[in-house]
Amino acid sequence: MKSLSKKKRGKFWLLAAMCVLLLCCAGCKDDVQLKLTTGLNEGELFRIEKKACTEAEARLFLMNQKNEYENTYGENIWKAEVGETTFAGQMKDQLQAFLYQLKGMVLMAESRGITLSDEEKGLAAVAAKEYMAGLSVEAASYLGMTEEQLTQLYQEYRLAERLVTQVTAIVEDEISDDEARVIEVQQIVFSKKKLAEDGRLVALSATELADVRAKAQEAADRAAAGDSFTLLQETYSSEPVGSIRVSRFDVDKAWENAVFVLGKEEISGVIETEDALYVVRCVNNLLGEETQTNKEVIRQRKKAQIFYQEYNAYVAKLLVQNKEGGWQSVAFTNWVPDCDVDFYEIYESVFHADPQ
């Protein structure tokens, strides 16, 4: 539950403000009507109504992400398996979704009469100039974008931010300590599933489940009698021994209702959820620092819910035209030049500079 540093805040702002990580809104394009076409202008990947996204814009965000991930995890990260696809495939899907969403948000902002001031337009030009000045000749050639086009992209990003701010302004700033409360607990876990011979997780039989419930009750009785909870974890639990820190939004409702009423050192009875049974000991019923941090997480989650209610209703009416085969040239496995400038960090430094 760490908060973002000021340097990183702008990098994740648009999507973090909607309670998701950068490029993690895969599936947004499913809310609009998709149509494959060959009728787009040269260099365009898709259009949402009259708002186009260019191949150069996709290359910019791809270059930004590709360099960051490779610097952190190495070049082989793209081959890593993620479910039924690779990390490269997953990131490409998320890049597509991010671009669909960005263009949709710009249209929505314009439909609501949101416009940029002359000062904001000037800041967009400053950001574009700084970005272009930091590109190597090789990176500039790969990008294939003029300073004017990049200025327009920074303006669109600003419009999207303004839209989120306007739509989510009704979210109250005050989040109670109890709503945001983070606690520390130890728990004994009894899974209601088992590993089948073919490697799948399957539900326990009725007889097996009855045995598990009996063991859970035995553990609860021993805990109530004063036996060492750590030793009981070692004896009974299907999960590692130790303590965990959780908020209300991390857990099943039945678990929340049973555990968040416990005081320090108090122990629950047997708690049953869909997937497991638990016996829980409360180590600390209020972690102050973590609770304060969690308030911002909750605030952003509420903003996300409000924003997407309006956004999804708006984009459901829009028509998207996709260039047939256009995305084949945009791939994280393709060669991309090194780039020392970051679109998001420049946006943050220009639009959210600390007052002097």
Predicted feature residues:
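C-terminal motif of bacterial Sec signal peptides marking the signal peptidase cleavage site
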Residues: L23-G27
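PPIase-associated folding chaperone regions across multiple families
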Residues: D30-N41, I48, A139-E208, V251-Q356
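Sec/Tat-exported extracytoplasmic proteins
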Residues: L62-Y69, L99, K103, L107-L116, ...
